[in-house]
Regions:
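Conserved G1/Walker A P-loop phosphate-binding module
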Residues: 1-102, 115-126
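Switch II (G3) loop of P-loop NTPases
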Residues: 122-142
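Conserved C-terminal guanine-recognition region of P-loop GTPase G domains, centered on the G4
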Residues: 117-120, 144-245, 250-272
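Catalytic micro-motifs at enzyme active sites that drive phosphoryl/nucleotidyl and oxygen chemistry
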Residues: 17-19, 94-101, 110-118, 139-145, ...
Length: 277
């Protein structure tokens, strides 16, 4: 800069300080889902797992970086839940916050450091955003989520009670009727439309951006899932991504979604994304 003084690199949008290892290759992950699916809870648990079991498994050093306000909130929520306290409140919708609040919204940023086996260190920055489920209930609101167009990958969190095949079970368990109105298929359709427009992908091609589909609250269905199912077995503790294990879980989740009247969502995934699990 012209002042020739010390400077700090920050994101031009949310003003989160960038670590020295941040580059254009550092992935930004968007976390989206229907209202009440548990996105903030998942992010709270993910933040803890990254800095404990995951870094041990991969012999890595993983730590929060930049502005840690959201990371601190996630840690407080996780601690409160562990003590049997309250769950985090619903994330405020995009349209219900001021422009200043939108512009200052911060991701949870983690730096993953790993030895590459040649006496050198590799570092990757992961950023996670939390989005209110109501923001994805209509295409008009979804278009306002400009950051989704900049993500390198998207995590879609689904509430199993949102599938029509589980509505009766949801009511028997006292699930709020209002949470059954937003269909998972509608949220996925809006995401597909946004990403197609952002990437200028025509109807004859598939979206190349990876999509991870996560089903929350799966423990509510353990009575109907065998104990030896891949969905209930502990995951691998080997220091690498287990492709066979991932594919096995993928196939079992797909079968569950089909049983829950989610066949339309599965076909939408297959027809619109080249990479998804």
């Amino acid at each position: 800069p012209d002042c020739l003084g010390p400077t700090t690199r920050v994101c031009p949008v949310c003003h989160t300080p960038w670590p020295s290892t941040f580059t254009a290759d550092s992935p930004l992950i968007g976390l989206v889902g229907v209202r009440g699916s548990g996105k903030t809870i998942m992010l709270s648990v993910l933040a803890q797992e990254l800095t404990t079991s995951i870094q041990r498994r991969f012999d890595a050093a993983i730590h929060p970086t930049g502005n840690r306000r959201l990371v601190s909130q996630l840690a407080n929520w996780r601690s409160d839940m562990g003590r049997g306290g309250h769950l985090p409140s619903q994330t405020e919708t995009y349209q219900h916050v001021s422009k200043d609040q939108r512009d200052s919204a911060e991701p949870a940023v983690f730096e993953w450091q790993l030895a590459d086996g040649r006496n050198r260190q590799r570092s990757t920055i992961f950023s996670f955003y939390d989005t209110a489920g109501e923001d994805l209930a209509s295409m008009d609101r979804t278009r306002e989520l400009n950051y989704l167009a900049a993500t390198d990958g998207v995590i879609l969190l689904l509430d199993p009670f949102g599938f029509t095949g589980n509505h009766d079970l949801a009511r028997s368990k006292g699930v709020d009727e209002d949470l059954l109105h937003d269909r998972p298929e509608d949220v996925l359709r809006n995401i597909v439309e946004l990403l197609r427009q952002a990437d200028q992908v025509g109807s004859k091609k598939k979206i190349s951006r990876p999509l991870a589909v996560v089903v929350s609250k799966i423990d509510a269905f353990f009575d109907s899932i065998d104990e030896d199912s891949p969905l209930r077995r502990p995951s691998s503790d080997q220091p690498y991504f287990d492709e066979a294990e991932s594919l096995e879980v993928h196939e079992h989740v797909a079968m569950l979604l089909d049983e829950w009247s989610g066949g339309g969502l599965l076909r939408m995934l297959e027809l619109n994304f080249s990479t998804f699990r």
